[in-house]
Amino acid sequence: MSAQPEDPGVSVVRLAPGPVTPDDVRTAARWLADGVGRHPDAAFDAQAGPVRWSCWATAEHVVDDLLAYALQVAGLPLLDYLPLAGPKGEDEIAHVKREAGAAGMAEVLLAGGELLAAQVGARPDTARAYHPYGLSDPQGFAAMGIVEILVHGRDILEGLTGIAPDLPEGLSARVLARLFPDLPDRTGDLPAAQVLVWATGRCELPGLARRTRWRWDATVR
C-alpha cells in the first residue's frame, strides 16, 4: 500500500466519518466474501499474510467473531462472553466444513455479517454488552466486527494472492473514529485505510514505527 494519499482531500473523510451502521457490516462482509470466493479451494492452505494461521483458519476466525459479537448483542451479558464452547471445549464455536471450499466460506461470511447487522439494527443505542476491551453498544460491536473483517480479510487476501489489498476507505474511517480515539495527530493527513492497517500492527507509516502491541477501545463515548 502506498504511504502517501492518492487524494489530498481523503483525510477529511476520517475527520467527519459518521456513525457505524448495520449496512456497513453487510458491506464489509460482501467485500471479503467477494474476495475469497474467486480463489481455488487449495489456496486456502497458505499462510494468511502476517498471522500464523492459514487463510482458511483465519476466515473461520472472522466467522467466529461475527457470530460471537451477534450473540453478545442478542444476549446483552454484562460480565463476560456468553458461556459457549466448541465441540472439543475450545473457545471457537464456528467451524466451516472444509469440503465446502471457497464458495461455502463466502456464503458463511455473508451470513455472519447479516446476523451481526440484524442484531445491531434490532437493539437501541442504549443497549450494552461485555467485551474484554470495554463494555460496548451495538455500534461498537458493529465496528469491531468490521475491523475483524477488514484487517483479517487483508491478511487472507494477501495470503491468497501475494498482494495486500487496499481496504475500503469509508468503512476504515468510521471504525477508526469509533474504536481508535487516541491516534497520533500525524495520522490525520493519511488515508484512513492506511491508518487502520497501521493501528492494527501491520505496517509502518511515515514517522511511525510498526506497532507491536495494540488494542481498540470498545467503550461508549
Regions found by a protein language model. Name each.
Residues 2-24, 31, 38-51, 68-91, ...:
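Structured surface interface patches that mediate subunit assembly and partner/cofactor docking
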